[in-house]
Each structure stands twice: as C-alpha cells, then as structure tokens.
Amino acid sequence: MSAKTEADNTTAANSGGGGVGSGTSSGGGASANGTATPARRLRTRNSTGNGTNSGSESVKKSNANDEPSTPVTPAGATGSHTHAPPGISPAVMERPMPSVPMNHASSSVSASKKYHNSCPHPTPTPAPTGHKKSVHTQPHSSNKFDQGKNEEFHFDTPPECPVFRPTTEEFKNPLAYISKIRSIAEKCGIAKILPPATWSPPFAVDVDKLRFVPRVQRLNELEAKTRVKLNFLDQIAKFWELQGSSLKIPMVERKALDLYTLHRIVQEEGGMEQTTKDRKWAKVANRMQYPSSKSVGATLKAHYERILHPFEVYTSGKVLGPTPTSSGSGSTPVKLEDGGGTDYKAHEIPTRQQIAPPNETNTRRSKRFGNSNASCGLSGVTPTTKPSAGVFVKTETKEEFKRDLLSSFNAVNSGGSPLATGTTANTRGASQKKGGEPPALIVDPLMKYICHICNRGDVEESMLLCDGCDDSYHTFCLLPPLTSIPKGEWLCPRCVVEEVSKPQEAFGFEQAEREYTLQQFGQMADQFKQEYFRKPVHLVPTEMVEREFWRIVSSIDEDVTVEYGADLHTMDHGSGFPTKSSLYLLPGDQEYAESSWNLNNLPLLEDSILGHINADISGMNAPWMYVGMCFAAFCWHNEDHWSYSINYLHWGEPKTWYGVPGSCAEQFEETMKQAAPELFSSQPDLLHQLVTIMNPNILMNNRVPVFRTDQHAGEFVITFPRAYHAGFNQGYNFAEAVNFAPADWLKMGRECVNHYSMLRRFCVFSHDELVCKMALEPAKLTFGIATACYIDMAEMVDTEKKLRKSLLEWGVTRAERRAFELVNDDERHCQECNTTCFLSAVACECNDKLIVCLRHYTVLCGCAPEKHTLIYRYTLDEMPLMLQKLKVKAHSFERWLSRCRDIVDAHTPTSVTLQELQELCKEAETKKFPSSLLIDRLNAAAVEAEKCVTVIQQLGINKVRTRSDHNQEAAQYKLTMEELELFVQEIDNLCCIIDEGASVRELLVLGKQFVERSESQLQLSLESLEESELETLINEGSSLRIELQQLDLLQKRLKQCKWYKRSQGLRETSSKLTYQDVKNLLHIAAADLDPTDPYVDKEMRKLQQIGADIEAWESQAAKYFRRLTQQHELGEIEQFLKSASDINGQVPSHGLLKDALRKAREWLRAVEQLQQNNHVTYCHTLEAMIERGLNIPIQLEELSRMQGHLNSAHQWKDNTACAFLKKGTFYTLLEVLMPRSDAINIDSDLKPRFQDDFLKEKNPAEIVASFKHAEEQELLDMRELRRQNMNKNPMRDMFCLCKSEFRNLMFNCQLCRDWFHEDCVPPPSATNQNGIVNGGSGPGTNRPKWLCPSCVRSKRPRLETILPLLVQLQQLPIRLPEDEALRCLAERAMNWQDRARKALSSPDVSAAQEAIMAQQQQKRRSEGGAGVGNISSPRKPRRRGSLTKEASGSTESDADDDDDEDECRLRIVEDNFSNDEDEPRTAPATSTVNSDLLKLLSDSEIENLLDLMMEGDLLEVSLDETQELWRILETMPPTLLQAEAMERVVQYMQRQRQQHTNPLPTSGAEDSNDSLMVQNSPNSNSNSGGATGSASNSGRNKKRRSNDTGGNSAVPRKKQSTPKQTPGKKGSAAAARKSDAKASPAASTTPGADADAENKQANGGNTNSSTGSGGGNSATTTPTPGSTHKKRKRTSTTATNNNNNNNNNSTNNSNSSTNLNSNTTSGQGAATGGNNATGGQKKHAQRSQQAAQEDDEEECRAENCHKPTGREVDWVQCDGGCNEWFHMYCVGLNRSQIKPDDDYICIRCTKTVAIGTQGSGHSMSVASTTTPGKQRAVQSAR
C-alpha cells in the first residue's frame, strides 16, 4: 500500500459499527451535513520547503499494510531481531542483515545488511479536551493462542500476485520498468518487485533519536461484520445498564448465544410476534445451526422475550403507550440475572475512540500560505445553509425530540422512531451531558409530579423521578412494571430511548499513552508475539499467523490489542533511505541517496507528475515510515487520487498484503456494502476512512478477485491506480512508502476527481491546477507527460467551455478573476461536492465566503442569477493559448497520431509498407508517446505483419520460384490449403503491405491447380497409370510449400503402381521368383498398399500361394536336416528334391539339400572302404573321417557311432597319460612309452626317431619290429652316452643341462653318468619317489640311486597299473599309436623281468645276496638294536688302501625339513685317492664283503648284472627286480673307467682349492664355489682302477651346545666318541673358557699313516674313517682346512688335536666340515692330505691374524643380537661349517645345559645340513657318529 494508504487507517473517521443512528459531528473537520472528512484529509501538505507547517504536525491516516519480514533489532536495542523468520525469500536472506546504525550523524548505514522498508500506517490524533480519556492498555490478548482453534479455522489463501525480478539494466529506470510490467501487474492490483542482489541500501534512520507514539488497534473491532455485532451488543448492554441490570450472554447448547444473529433472523421472519404466531422458532433454531429440537426453539424464544424484545419495544416507541394505572399490577418485571450466562462487558467503542477531529493543519490538503486558522471542515457553514439531500441531515434538538416523542405517545399504534437518521461525522464530538435539563414543556409546576403515563399524581410512594429529565412515573405504570425503587440512577423510558439511540461517535484508532523508541517497541513486539504463540518469533510460520489473524478479527469474544507505529513523517524523523541532504554520507551511501528507487526521489522523477507539485504533501510525495508488530493491520483502501504507491520493507519480519484490481473497485465496494449494510447506511464514505477490514474469503465468495503476497525485507510492493489493498504485519518490522504518478496516471486522476465529487470527498490537491501548471511550463515536461497533459487539458477546456456557457445561459453576467492557487484549499472547495476549485467557481452576494463549482451553481443559494458572480482563473481565450503551447510540444505526436489513425482505419486502403509501420512504432517508443489505444493497435498491427513475414520465411514460400524441381528441400513447416487461404486473407487485412504477400497468393493459385490435376490421376486404374506422370505430379506437389492431402494419395498410388508392375514383371520372366522376392513384395503390399484395390488383391493372392508352397517344401527339408538319417533313407531325399520343380518359385534349401545328399553318399562309400581293410583303423584316420562327416548338413547315423568309438579311445588315452605322465611335463605320452630315440639331454631339439613308425598305418608285425629296433638303438646310444660322460674332463668339458663348467655342488646320474648342478635339476627329494629311486628300502642297502630328469621321463608306474589299461584296449575297435607303444613297453618290461629273475636266481648271485644279508644282520647285532638312522657301526680293521663301505641310515630332520617322507642318506667316506706323488697308484683292496662278492660272482655275471641294471633303468616301468639288482651292485667296486673319471674330478677340485689363498667363507654353504659333493654309482668302487684314500677325525676340544630356541637355533649333533687329547687340554679348556669360547679343530692329513693307526681309530671310536667305496657313491670334495685357535677378549682356550701330524687324511666330521654347499667336506675320503694341511695352516694363520685384529670387537652373528652386558658373557661357536661365534643368550642356550661333548650347529648350517640330507644318495653328507647313548642325550636335550 502507499504512504497514504496506511496513514488513513488512523484518522478519526466515522464508525461504521458505532451505532445505527447518525449525528452531527462536533469537530471542526466535520461537515455540517454529517459527512465524515476523508482520512486523506487528515494529512497536511506543507507549503514551505523544510516540511514544517504553521499548525501542528501533519498527520497521516492509519492503515497498516505490509508483509512479514525478518525481525531486525536496530543498533543499541537489546531485542533479538537478527533472525530470519519463515517466509523470508532466499534473495533477501542471501544478503546479510546488519543491525540498524546507532548514530545517524556519524553513519547513515550499517556496514553489513541494510534493512528494507514496508508500508504506511495511520497516525493518531489527540483526544479532544473535555472528552473522557480512555484507559490505555499494553498490547495484549484475552486468550492465549490455541493451536486447535487455529487449525479448525478455515481460510482459503488467495492466489499469489506476480513477482518481478528486474535485471540490473532494467532496474536503472523504475518508472519505465513499472510501465513495462503494468499490463500484467495491473490485473492483480498489487505486484512485488525483487531488486537485484547487488542493490542493498543502508538504513539511514537515527535510531537513537527516533521516538514515536503508536496507535492502538483492537483487532475484532476492525472487521466490518464483527464491528456490527459488537455495536449491537453494546447497545443491548447499555440499554439494560440504564434499566439497572447487567447483560449476561446466555448459553444455548453449551455455546454463547449470538444475540445479533438471533435478532436479525427474527426480524427477517417478521418480528417476534409474527414468529411466535407462525411457530417459526424451530426454523430460527435451524437457521442458527442448532440441532432440530423443540426445546431449542422454546429456549431461543424465552431469551428473545427476556433480553431483546424489551429493547425492541423501547426503541420502537411502543413502550411509551399508556398503561392501566393499577397499583396492584401483577406483572412481574423481567430480571436478566435470572437467565444466567456470561456477563457481557461493553466494548464502549464510541467512548474509547472519541478522537477529536483533526485540525486543518493536520490534514493532507495543501496549505501553501500557512493559514492555520482556515477550516477544512464545515464549521463555518451557517445554519441557513441548505442541506443537500442524502448528505446534510437535520439534527434535532432535545426539546424537539421530546415534543415529537410526546406526540407519539398519543398515537396508540405509533411505530415511528423518534430518532433522527443521518450520517455520522468524521470525528467524534463530546458526548452529550447526561444531566442536561430540557426546556420546560408544562407551565404548571405540578405537572412535573404527575405520572407521564397515567397523568395522575397519586401514589407518590411509587412515583419515580428520572435522573435525566426529572419526569415522574409510577413504578406500576412502567412496562415492565417495577416492584421496588431501583438503586442508583434511573432513566425514564424516553431518556433510555434517547440514550440508547444516541448517534455513535466516529470510529477511529486510539492513541497509545506512552512513547517508544525503536528498541523498546521491538522488545514489546517480540515479547507479545512470543508469549502469544508460545514459541520463538522466528519459528512461527507465516501461514499460521495469517490464519490466526483472520480468526481473531472475526471473533467477538476474543479481544486482542496491538499497537502500530504508523505515518512517521520522514520530514520529522528522517528517512530510512540516505538522502541527498544527509550529513556525513559514506562513499557507498551516495549511490543510494541518488538512486531512482530511493522513495525520496521516486515521486519527483522527471517522468513523475507529482514532481510538478511544489508543496510537500506528506505521505504522497514525501514518504511516510511504519513500525509494525504482529497483527498490526492496515484496512481496505485505495490511494488518494487513485495514484500509484510503492512500499519498501527496510528490515524485519514479513508484511502480508491483499489486493483487488482497480478494474474491480466498484464490485469490491458493492460487496463491502452488502456484507455490512448497517455500517454503510450511516457512513457511506466508510471505505475512505481506512478503519474497516473484511476477510478476503468473503470477497472471493462474491467473485471479487483477490491476490496476496508476503513482502520480505528488501522487497518492493507496488499498488496500481484505484486498486484496493489491505494487510497486516507478521511481526516487528520497519517499512517506508510513498505515492507516485507517471504520465499514464493523468487520465485516472481526472476520473478520480469526478468520482470524489459524487462522493463529496475532499481532494488532496487540485487536479486542474496541476494540469495548468504543467501547461504553463511545457519545456520542463517530457514528451510523454506533455502529450498526456495535452490530452487531459483538451478535455478540461472543452468541459469548462460547456459549463461557462451553461452558467451564462442561466443568467450570470458578472465575472471576477481570482488567483485560486493563492487561496487555501479549505477556502476554495465547492460547498456541494467538496471539489477544490481552480478554473472557475460561482459565488453570491448573500454570502461571499461560500462558493460552488460550475456543476452545482443552482444549489448555492436561492438568490437570483443576477446576484451570482463567476470567479475564474483564466479566460476562455487564455486557455486555448495554454493548450497550444502543449500542442507545439506534442506537435510531432499529433502528426504521428493523424497518420496512425489512417493506418488503423479498416475502411481506408493502406499504402504503408511494413518498414514504414515499424518506423512509426519506433518513433512512438523513442519519443515516449503516452500509452493509448491507438499505440496499442499500431503495435499490434506491426506485430501481426511481422508474424506473417516470419511465417512466410519459415515456409520458404518466396523461394519456390527459384529452386529446381529436382533439388527440393524438405520444408520445415507447411500449410494446408484451408490454412493458406486464411493466411492470404490475413495478409490482405493487414494495416501495411508486405512484399512477400504476392508469393503467397501465387502459391495459392498453384496449389489449386495441383489439386485439380491430382484428382484426375487418382481416378485412373493401376493398369492405366504411368509411373512417370505420377512422379512428375508428385515432384510438383513437393515443390509447393503446402500440406496437400492429394500428395499423400499420389505417393500411395505410385507405390501401388510400382509394386504391381514389379510383381507382374517378376512372375512373367523365365526364371522363378525367389522366396525373398515373394516376402518383400508381400511385406510392401501389407505395409504400404491398399488391399481393397482389385488389382492389388489379385496379385497378392498369387504371391501368397507361391510363398506357401515354398514354406511347405522348406519345412519338410528342415526335417531332413535335423533328424538322424540312415543310408536307406537317402533315396527318399532324392525323390523329395525332384518335387521342387513343381513350385513356381525358387526353393532356398534345394541346392543345399542336394549338395548334402551328394556328400553323404561319398562319405558313406569312404566309410565302407575303410571297414573293408583287414587291420583296425587308426585313431587319426577315424578323426579325419569324423571331421569330414561333420561338415555334411545331414545327420548320419554312422557318424554318431564313429564318434562314440573315438570318445572311448580318447578316454583310454587320458587314463594312460594320467598313469605315466608327470604334472607339467613336456613329454608326450607317445614319447614316454616308446624307447628313447636318442639318448640325449632334455634340452635337445633333435627330432625323435622311430615315432613316425607308430604314426604310420602298419601291421602289428611291422610295429613290433620297429619297436625292437628302437630298443636296440636305445641301448647302443645309452652306452655311448655313458662312455662320453665318464670321459669328460672337468677342466674343459661342459656339464649339466645348462652346458656350463663343473662347479659347486654336482649330482651324478646313475644312468647317463652325466653331472648336474644343484640349481639346474630338481632336488633329490623331488626325484626320490616310488619307482624313480630304486634300492633304498631293502634290508641290504640304505642308499638310493639318483637319476636325472632326462632319464626319468615319467611316473614309472608299476606293472600292475599297466595291466588294466591293456585289458581296456581289447574293447577298442580302433588303433592308437599309444596303444601299440604300451603293448610293446609291457612286453619289453616282462621280457626284462624274466631275464632279471633268471640272473638273480643263479647260485652265485643268490650266495652274494645271502652274504649281504648276513652283514646287515651282524651290524644290527653289534649296534645293540639301535635305529638305522644316525648310528654307524665300527668298522673292521683293513689294509691301507683298501676300500670300505659304510652305510648310514636315513635321518629325520625335524628342524628344517617339512617333508614328512624319510630321506635315505648315503655317507660317502673319502676315497683313498692319494695325493702323494711318490705313492704308486694301485687298485685298493676290497673289504671282507667285497672280497666275498668278488669270489662268488664272475666277471661275466657282474657284467650281466650291470647290463640288466642299465636296461631296467631305461624302462619307464617300476619293477622290484631293479631294487634287488641295486642292493647287489651297490657293494661292487667301481669300474676302471669310473675310477678314472672320479680321479679327474678330484684332481680338478684339488687344483681349485689350491687356487684359493683366502680362508674359506663362513657365511654358509650357498656362498661356496670351490666345494663340491658328488655321488657315484654303486659300481664306481670296483677294483678296476679307482683311487682310494683314508680319512681320520682330527681331535679337538669339545664345546657346549644345546637346542637353540631363538631365531638362530639349530639341530644339535653329538659326536660318536671323544677324540684323544693332550693331557690337561680338556680340563684347561673347560675351566679357562668362561664365555664358552672354543677352538675349531685343526684337520690335517698325513700321507704316511698306516692302516693300524687307522683301524685303531676306527675300533676305538675316536676316528671315523672309511674308504671311498660304496657302489659308485665315492665323491670328490674340497677338504676343510683345519681351524685355528680363536681368541676371545675375556677368556680364550686353544685346543690342539692329538694326532694332527699323524694322519694322512683329514676326517670330515659332521660338526667340523660343511655339508652339501659348505666349503668343507662331510664324511668323505679324498686324496688331499697335503692340501688339507696347507689349507689348515693358511686358515690358522689367517684366523689368528683376524683374531688379533678384531680382538674382542667381534660381533655376535645372531640375526637379532640382544647385546648382553656384564662381567662374563658366554659365547658358543658353530660346528656346522661356518665357524661363527654367537652369544649363548642370543641363541637361547644356558651354560648349565651344555655338556663338554656337545656340538652346536647354527641355523644357517642346519639348513645346509638339511639340504645335504635331502641329497643323500647322490651327494656328500655329514657322517653321524653319535653313539646310542649320546644320541638319546641329544634327543632329551631337544
């Protein structure tokens, strides 16, 4: 709402609900006829520039309008208003909301958020002197918020008004933007504008200085219907109060009785008497929505008779009729107290709101000369002023009233009311004094003691005197009669009627008693809202507040009072916006001070008409501010002079608005009058007073369009001309509003003045004066304003001429010029219509102070026309001159207007082009011509023409004539012929000429011609049609931009024609139709053709028959392809193929079936030939036949049978491969089963021989011969390979699979005799499987034999496994290469088995076996039943150079080897290959067993056994006889060739050892490069020339050891016996070594050692010596040099061997020599005595030097050394070969647990020993010489 809008709410205005009667207003601002001064007139228009008025401060109407906004607390306030309540728009919330600045002088805006403004509200006027001052109360509510009532109350929310969001560019010009949106927003009456996010003005009010007195609003008194009810109840209560009783509202059906509704319904039914007579009380109860019950009607009747009927009687005058004077009257007076109910407290609306009429200085009318004494009301009107009917109502005096009342007493049926009727005044006068004395009506003094009813003076004790008029009455004459004298004041019936019917005072808003600061008001407002809703203010939804507001205003029993700080003048308090005159503006504030949207600048813009008014009209061209709280409302109103208004909400909670479009204003006013006729009957101008509100739902139910919006902080709300609007505040907020008037308002402004004249409403300013002022200064006007002013002034001048002419004709001849602009507005208004006069007026000689306008000169007075004088401002000649000045300004507009009239005239032929029309429209926009219907029509015409051009361009009509017929573009849009005709008509009706119109007309002609030709072609039959003619016609139609129906028909016809002729052509040709052609033709026919055409139908039937025949044949052919066909059925297929010739089409599968038949017959012939062969067919031949048969489409039964045979063969082959082939092998099954084609290594790429013989189809005899030949060749090749391998020289030949030099640990294969590196072949445990390692399980041997991977190619299954496979072969009807190979292999194995058994059964061999068994039994007896594992029996004495064999049982390694399979380890003693050059090389003597064997077996038998062993090893089958042979041959000495090969290896290793000058590394066996342990075959120790050697253990001191439980624990090993020591050495070593330091034994060899010493050592257990025999198990190693004495810092002990210089060979003990990969030999004999000594000396010297250098800085070699400290630290040295030192603590040993004869082996050497253990049988290993007792001790130590 506008500034004025809200302000008018607070003006003292006539109360629509104050009473039913009207009276004369006593204020100076009220008219004499009782017409209320409009609320707008309470505002003052100041004449001076500083905004001051000579009178009191200007006051604005009090009508609150805004929408809820975020509550904001100004700086310095303690209230919390920084929250954003629900409903705040995101656009506003995105901007920070700072507090209001503290000091306006220092800072006009807060640094953060600048708050936003809302709408104007009413300003109170002080109560007049002498009036009873109403008691002011703080805002309160009689009832607390009830959620249930709120939800039960039904309120239909009106639709939202439009919301506009201007861009930054659009926001620059507010009036232009408002004009732009006016066409949309004006339909709703209100609109909301959201500024750009960058626009955030500061809040410039000085909050410390701002103090204001708000107005009090009682919400339920605002609503029209509620006010009527309250007024009625107040009259009833007052009536009974004057009767000495208090009114109590009775309860009916547990609800308070609505007395007003009951009274209204009863009156509508004809009154109480008629209702009772017609028995309508039940109907009355129904209409009041009570349940249907007789008792309710009777109850209502009783209440009506008791409460309402006496009131009716008194007010109608019937009560004053004479009654019988009987003192004994038995009538019982009615007592209201008897009815019970709720006490009614009168609202006293007239008393509370007796606000004095505003002084003229407080009005909004302009006072340009400060005439504060001039009255704006009608107080100056003399009593002789002739009242106007319906406006001025006579006010009777009290005497006249009494006289009339007395005269009515004499009329028995007098029903006339003695009350005068009339409109209420604008302001309230002082209430009439109750005790006023009426003039005497009776001269006789006794008359005053006579009853005025019975006219008798007797019964004085019952005589009552009225306290109002002193009349006397008998108590029994009264109706109802009184039983006693009432206490207190008593009024007679006349005074009661007079008092009750006293006219109501004008209704207005009461002024609060206290003054608020902004902070105090905010605290009060927030406290009220929080206490009312019982929740924080920001958590209350706007919908809930809205529904509660309308519930409260419609309730008569809930009193809610709020306060509203409305109409705060910016001239007095400053504006919320920074202004140009503000002091100390911040740099950022200057932009907003000059902004066009600043409400201080907006009304005065160049395009605003209000800028031409010199005076400051507060609230209209000077903004007003409003401080709202929850429920504070502004009532329904529209703006003064129907101007625009703009409202800005600076900050705070939202403001809710409701608006009605200006076009529906009259409908709105009529609805309001119908809803509350009692108010409008006494106050016709009620809507001008801004004191009445009505629920929008009532308006909506009467089809009045209502729109709503919620205005948030930072948002604008615009109201449009004559748009009624109202609203309320959601909470504490601050708003600012002002009016403005753009050029388009000027026409509405004149209509408003005429409307005001009919309503007798005062104007705020003179409209004619404003127009004339602008006409006098046309240069200052914009073109738009000048044009609008010219149009308005032309109308004004025409009207003035007519009025003056009428006045002249009436007879007025005198005239007088007067400058009306110098006269106060209150002195120049028409006495009839209150219009402010400016151009002219009429005065009379009888009263020169009164004037009227020229429309009402006849009602001025009754004098003759000659006495009247015309007062004028301008002559009739001057006004056209003024008009001409405007015309010159608007001359271009006039010319433009004249030309436009001709263009839009439908009867005038147009010659204007579209370009000229667009130029005219552009000229109107550029020169800002005022909006008019002509401009709208012109713009519409231009738009229509542009649309036509656009359509033509989109259709491409103008391109039709320029394109080739064969290069058509698909038109995006096309018109039908009907649309094209209408389009041509539209082009012809345009206001301009468009160049493209000719093309459209030509197109229409071409379209009509095409239609005619198309129709003729469509009538022809298919046989008569020509494709070329149809195609040509279609191309022509496609080139036209027309949607032609005939074009689709032609295209369909063309398809039919093409299809028909194609089908006929295909059928009539010599070749048959293919099935695909038939399908395509039928598909096209079904999809695109019309089957109803006879030609098409006939052709389709023929094609369908052909297709059916082909499908039937194809279906039968498919069966032949799918089913299993036998040979005799092929003839049936051949007959079926012949039937295809009877079909008129080509059968697709004919050729395929014919070819399949041919192939099937050929394949069956080939199978028949194959079956005629004498031998069984090979598998690969059968596979080829099956593959060939699978390519035949026909399923042959013979093929399925052959596939079954082939699958059985493959299954047998898989089973055989599973039995023979190892996992991951690269040998094929055939290669494994056949003899070796070449005795070659695995990596050989030579192609195997003899394999092709098995793949070729040969008879069985030939295959067996080939296999035999392959066997013989295999034996020859193997012998040659063995010879080559044994003749290899380690120094120059290559070994192993990798073809590299002889190095590190080497394994010797017992079959091919080649040497293999440890890391090139699988470990021995991997090959020590059943069937691979032969001879390790019998009682006569403990040493397995090792075969290389090249020699062991398969799993070597036992013969029992092979036999089931051979049985399965008998069931296979086909042959396999593997089949033949397996048969030959089985036959070969059984043949060898027979020969081996024969050889083993000979007497000599049997005797040898018995000797071996006897030896084993003797050894077991000598060992005392000890296990075979780690125990070695003592050897018998032997001669020097003899060969001895010692077998050691398998040993379990629990510490490092996870393999649960027992490993058989063969300990090889050193061969007696002497390194002494002087000693002759002779064959060593054999032991007792060897000698016995040599005696028992002849050379031929031995050779036979060796050949059988080699041939058995070649077999890929495991046989028991191979083990028996191995047990015999392992005891044989090596052959001469083997011995020579071994000697070469030993010599090579000796040279390698001599080349190493540095001591051997101690890091582990894996780091050694000069130590190698190899194993020879069992016959390597034969007497044919092998080198021998002896070895003896060197004595040493014992060392404590135990099982290491730490990370370095190792397997402890005990020695077999304690070697001899020098006397005193052992004790000294044990005593002196506190840290358990020890000295490694020094190993030395003595070439001159004799056999006795050696035998003595062996027998005494102190020396472990053996010969290098053992069936090929002799090995060459690098002997370990003797260890030197080690020193420790704390304690050191040196131990010497007692026989260092006595032995020729160093004994390799398991605790002092390396195994497998270590640098020392393990239990072998080597002819390296001298080198051993040399090595020992070198090592001794080096270790001694190192010990001296390192001294006690040597570190513990444990992986996780704990660095123990203390006086004594115990150490231990490894005996496993690395000779490293360890802290006992670090390896988990305890000194008390170690015995002197224990050895310690570290974790590294333990792993090395484990590796040697796995390699036993083919590599050198540590000899275990522990005695059984000590062995048990070691086990217990573990």
UniProtKB/Swiss-Prot annotation:
Residues modified to Phosphothreonine: 323
Keyword Transcription regulation part of the UniProt annotation: yes
GO molecular-function term, one example from the UniProt record: histone H3K4me/H3K4me2/H3K4me3 demethylase activity
Record-listed Phosphoserine modification sites: 1422, 1433, 1474, 1635, 1640
Domain JmjN: 161-202
Main location: nucleus
Any one GO BP annotation for this protein: larval somatic muscle development
Zinc finger (PHD-type): 448-498, 1293-1354, 1753-1808
Effect of residue 637 to A: Abolishes enzymatic activity
Record's keyword terms, sorted: Biological rhythms, Chromatin regulator, Coiled coil, Developmental protein, Dioxygenase, Iron, Metal-binding, Nucleus, Oxidoreductase, Phosphoprotein, Repeat, Transcription, Transcription regulation, Zinc, Zinc-finger
Residues engaged in binding Fe cation: 637, 640, 725
Segments forming a coiled coil: 960-1049
Lineage top rank: taxon: Eukaryota
Cofactor(s) recorded in Swiss-Prot or TrEMBL: Fe(2+)
Compositionally skewed regions (Gly residues) per UniProt: 15-31
UniProt keyword annotation of Transcription present: yes
Region feature (Disordered): 1-150, 321-380, 416-437, 1401-1462, 1548-1751, 1814-1838
One annotated Gene Ontology cellular component of this protein: nucleus
Domain ARID: 226-316
Free-text comment on the cofactor: Binds 1 Fe(2+) ion per subunit.
Family according to the record: Belongs to the JARID1 histone demethylase family.
Protein function: Histone demethylase that specifically demethylates 'Lys-4' of histone H3, thereby playing a central role in histone code. Does not demethylate histone H3 'Lys-9', H3 'Lys-27', H3 'Lys-36', H3 'Lys-79' or H4 'Lys-20'. Specifically demethylates trimethylated H3 'Lys-4'. Required for the correct regulation of homeotic genes during development. Plays a role in the regulation of the circadian rhythm and in maintaining the normal periodicity of the circadian clock. Regulates the expression of clock-controlled genes including tim, per and cry.
Record note on quaternary structure: Interacts with Myc. Part of a complex containing Lid, Myc and Ash2.
PANTHER family linked: LYSINE-SPECIFIC DEMETHYLASE (PTHR10694), LYSINE-SPECIFIC DEMETHYLASE 5 (PTHR10694:SF33)
Name of the featured protein: Lysine-specific demethylase 5
Organism: Drosophila melanogaster (Fruit fly)
